[in-house]
Amino acid sequence: MPKDKALKKVMVIGSGPIIIGQAAEFDYAGTQACRALREEGLEVVLINSNPATIMTDANMADRIYIEPLTPEFVAKVISQERPDALLPTLGGQTGLNLAKQVADAGILDQYGVRLLGTPLESIKRAEDREHFKNMCLEIGEPVPESSIISDVDAAVAFARKIGYPVVVRPAYTLGGTGGGVAFSEDELREIAVRGLTMSIIHQVLVEKCVLGWKEIEYEVMRDAAGNCITICSMENIDPMGIHTGDSIVVAPTQTLSDREHQMLRSASLKIIRALGVEGGCNVQFALDPESYDYYVIEVNPRLSRSSALASKATGYPIAKVATKVAVGLTLDEIKNAVTGKTYACFEPALDYVVVKYPRWPFDKFSLANRNLGTQMKSTGEVMAIGRTFEEALLKAVRSLETGVTGMNLPELREWDNDRLRARMARPDDLRLFLVAEALRRGFPVNEIFELTRIDRFFLDKIKNITEAEELVRAARPTDVGTPTGVGAPAGLTPELLRRVKRIGLSDTTIAELVGTTSREVHRLRRELGVEPVYKMVDTCAGEFEATTPYYYSTYEDEDEAEPQAVRKVVVLGSGPIRIGQGIEFDYCSVHSVWALKEQGVKAIIINNNPETVSTDFDTADRLYFEPLVPEDVMNILHKEKPDGVIVQFGGQTAINLARPVEKAGFNILGTSVADIDRAEDRERFDQLVAELGIPRPPGGTGFSVEEAQRIAEQVGFPVLVRPSYVLGGRAMEIVYNSQELLEYMADAVRVTPKHPVLVDKYLLGKELEVDAVCDGETVLVPGIMEHVERAGIHSGDSIAVFPPQTLTPEIKEQLFEYTQQIARALKIRGLVNIQFVLHEGRVFVLEVNPRSSRTVPYLSKVTGIPMVNLATRICLGATLPELGYRGGLYEETRNIAVKAPVFSFAKLLDVDVCLGPEMKSTGEVMGVSKDYALALYKACLSAGYTLPSSGKAVVTIADRDKDEALPLVRSLVNLGFEIVATEGTAAFLRSRAITVEVARKVHEGSPNIVDLIRENRIHLVVNTLTKGKLTTRDGFRIRRAAVEMGVPCLTSLDTARVVIEVMRARQRGETMPLIPLQEYVS
């Protein structure tokens, strides 16, 4: 069936900001979809609120609207653009929910827009728990005993009937938001309240819990003619009870018999046919390990995180094929772009093993609850490919960049067996390391199985890893007199090395086991000829020649990667998405690859994140799906011998590799390693700015607790303290007295024992940020960004405004001058990011990042300057004047663009939501308008602030902020809010003639402030931090209750000020014109 001729213009809904549960996989899917539609000659209109994505680039669609993803704005775009059809299945849960809302509101009928791909009825059948359960029963597919509930008492009654534990799954939510496993009535009541609040249709499913059964997933594809194929089967290493996004997943399935595989494959095809899905779909099963019993758990009738994994694991471009199916093509008409010969109706075949490992944010949130359940907590993931499960697992662990290179966590050696058993029985992020430690201690596999319910097959594989460690340890020299690091012991024979490398042990692990250095092991391996070969991912297990191959390393004989003798450059990617290093860096890597290809240079990318555009099969000329650690990167560089390596686009991950790459004799393009170090090393940077005469907050480096105390007293409290070399402000804090400093030193200096702690005077003032492009001489500043929140709140968590609204021309000129002096002094070739603070009328420099930053995509879009393209061409030797740009501060645009952070606090219980120098946001959105208040309004709306127009506002303010807060409270009263406060703040406000309702503090009994919030009687919370992060404090409890009940919670007076401005704009009822990206800069 050929393409539908009636279609001329298609609208695509993106998935919005990155949050836990919905990450970069939808940028990758959306980018593929937009390209596929344009390949078919269609005009494409896109709406998405996330400026950090590739899909919102001007060349990806004909008209791009970076607008809030709300029914109102989707309707506005439909009315303005009049598309023939809407494609919602590539925008994650957000896209599906919006499609349902605009369809239910009659918008699609009004404008004659039809839904492409999976019909709305099918979406409802799959997403609505009751419809889905009934459909499964009709076609004879088993589902767990369950009940659809819309009030808490009904949930309790049903649980009494079927017995605990039970699972709560809210309808139409993402990443298990609001769900959980309840083992008692109290737990059920708490989870049910949260789940009903989070579901857009106020509905949850309570079902029998099959904890301990295997969790199996099938990724399937169907076209309108009814042709169905399974693309990939996946097995969660963790049993049922843990959200699949938080599970370690292996593809293809490893422990199913052929009968089990055929049984579940047939069931998934039967379900997709009954649903009438057109496109990609993911089916999840629970399988009893002791019998052939199974249950259908759920279906995603859209592209999902699992589809991204299945796509990268098999090389089958699911999003592209799903899009072509949506416009009417059938699977036997769509060519497989990887082979160029086969068609999309061929099921992929795998001759390797893939492991996906989640990346959790517990390094940022040390107080968060690390236990894993049905509510997702990971921010990103890595994928690794090997010939054996062991090899793929160890590569995945290396890829996480948590400082661990094998299955060995030194701190576990201190634990006794009882503690080990207790922790193994409760799933958390350390579980596999606990299993490995138990195996080293001789625990029987059966006992570990009973504790964890992880299949014995996987436990045996982990045992193979611990036995390989023993073989290496036995090669350690016995005479203690041998100094370590002098050379590798003779016991490391080529046979032993080859054997343990096949299992996946890293050079670092081997070095630790025999008491030498990883460089020494690397040298020995190369000397003995024990080097990896590279195999191809080609969708067909080598049956057909692949034209767009990508590679993984393994220790076998036959090599499939022939290096080409052409001009080529390696771009180092940014690895998994985590707080502090998000999709922005993937955006930069991809743009760098495109710039290289434009210049006729072969582009090679190394990355390990399955969710991203950079790891798509046709982004680079060559893709290596490998860990971004020195060993794996050097192996590739020795193989490819590139003309140069670009490190400035992969965030701190790539910057950290610059020195090892240079030491190994490879050429770093762009800013030199020595100059990168001058920017990042505290003392050398201080010296540089002192020579240039640029003011900097006074401070120093403390190598001991006493020294840090002395510096703090010298410069005067408050001070900002942090370890040297950090990303995302990890373990940074503002401390107000010497007692707090001592507490910080006790907790945080352990972060990097080798590195000292930096102590700076904390200057209160406006934070300003500059991204610049420099060719070593000419400096171009596309724009200055002004932060709404004052210095002291991490730049990634601040609302940024461009162009700046309150700066004088003199200050702007001074910012440019300082940027130019610093960029020239550091001999920057490429991008640089500089942060300043305006304190009492003077500009001080805070820090310099000699690389791309998280604001580059946002600034590139709103100014129209292709910053990454220019920086890449400078790396290749061009100058700015040759590229048509003279230096200076670029002319400001008429439109105002506001970038706002997005947080995932609802997913992370026990995490404080207050803002500070430690970054906490997972994503970002943008609002654009000619009017500042409207741009702010759009940004707040996109960021998910459900702003009330009136109601009750809780105001609890720290003493030092009370005077400053007064005008804000008056504004709230003028807007029609009633003020609620605890005794201290209430007395202060009353003395200033403001009417206040007094509420109890938490420890004063009920009903207190937290009770009022939980009873939905509060509509806004303004709460500034009183010192102390303890989770028992009132402030912490108020903030957490607000997040869990979906009440806007403002912890910075600066944010509160702009939010009040937004409420005013909304009350004025101003109209909001839509501006497509293509018209921003014209």
From Swiss-Prot:
It is an enzyme of class 6 (ligase). Residues 945-1082 are annotated as: Allosteric domain. Binds 4 Mg(2+) or Mn(2+) ions per subunit. Residues 133-327, 686-876 form the ATP-grasp domain. GO terms for cellular component: cytoplasm. ATP 1 binds at residues 129, 169, 175-176, 208, 210, 215, 241-243, 284, 298. Residues 562-944 are annotated as: Carbamoyl phosphate synthetic domain. GO terms for molecular function: ATP binding; carbamoyl-phosphate synthase (ammonia) activity; carbamoyl-phosphate synthase (glutamine-hydrolyzing) activity; metal ion binding. Its cofactor is Mg(2+); Mn(2+). Mn(2+) 2 binds at residues 298, 300. PROSITE patterns: ATP_GRASP, CPSASE_1, CPSASE_2, MGS. Mg(2+) 1 binds at residues 284, 298. Pathway: Amino-acid biosynthesis; L-arginine biosynthesis; carbamoyl phosphate from bicarbonate: step 1/1; Pyrimidine metabolism; UMP biosynthesis via de novo pathway; (S)-dihydroorotate from bicarbonate: step 1/3. The keyword ATP-binding applies. Mg(2+) 2 binds at residues 298, 300. It catalyses: hydrogencarbonate + L-glutamine + 2 ATP + H2O = carbamoyl phosphate + L-glutamate + 2 ADP + phosphate + 2 H(+). Mn(2+) 3 binds at residues 835, 847. Residues 945-1082 form the MGS-like domain. The large subunit is composed of 2 ATP-grasp domains that are involved in binding the 2 ATP molecules needed for carbamoyl phosphate synthesis. The N-terminal ATP-grasp domain (referred to as the carboxyphosphate synthetic component) catalyzes the ATP-dependent phosphorylation of hydrogencarbonate to carboxyphosphate and the subsequent nucleophilic attack by ammonia to form a carbamate intermediate. NCBIfam families: CPSaseII_lrg (TIGR01369), PRK05294.1 (NF003671), PRK12815.1 (NF009455). This is Carbamoyl phosphate synthase large chain. It comes from Desulforudis audaxviator (strain MP104C).
